[in-house]
Amino acid sequence: MTAIMFDIEALDIRPTAAIASIGAVLFEPRSDWIGDTFHLHVSLENCQRHGLTFGASTITWWMGQDDTARQTLINGQLDAAPLITALEAFSAFCPTGADIWCNGNSYDMPILANAYHAVGIDTPWHFYNERDLRTLKGLNKTLRIERSGTHHNALDDAIHQARLVQHILQFNSDLDA
């Protein structure tokens, strides 16, 4: 069954964080198939107008990141979509009833869900479809795959994370995810 892996780049660690970008990919967890991708930059000014927050420690952390990641974050603001536009586009990208994966259910999922709440629209997933890569990685601490793309680029991270799920589930065929 087709699933979604998403990643966000945000400017705070709280669930109320302003979102700078959303990246996602459709994938089959039990095969090597990687499908359509989604990547949108979100207007930070518009996020602020919707009450989303910025954290000094996160902004300082971004200052210390790789030049490519920082420039992508900065340049993305030049053509960034309003928050509601980005979320409506992400909702349209998500297949109905699909499992939705992220690296950790304590960061990406609540931040994205809160952004939907802030603009008054429902998330395109149900709570029972939420999946967490961090749990799988914890069960398979020695498995590694080659990384491609830029760290902290939402789309590159989503693709890498989808490949990690595929690799872990293929290596552990007895897991039912």
Residue ranges of model-derived segments:
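Short intrinsically disordered terminal tails
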Residues: M1, F54, S173-A177
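Short, flexible loop segments at boundaries between secondary-structure elements
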Residues: P124-R144
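Acidic, Mg2+-coordinating catalytic module of metal-dependent nucleases/exonucleases
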Residues: D99-S106, P110-I111, L143-A177
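Active-site catalytic microenvironments for nucleophilic, acid-base chemistry
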Residues: A115-V119, L139, H167-F171
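Conserved non-catalytic scaffold segment of RNase H-like nuclease domains
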Residues: T2-I4, E9-C102, S148
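Anionic group-transfer/hydrolysis microenvironments
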Residues: E9-L11, V25, G104-N105, P110, ...
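Substrate-recognition/cap helix-loop segment adjacent to the acidic, metal-dependent catalytic center
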Residues: A89-C94, S106-F127
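Short, function-defining helix-loop hinge/capping sites that tune catalysis or transport
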Residues: P15-A17, N140, V165
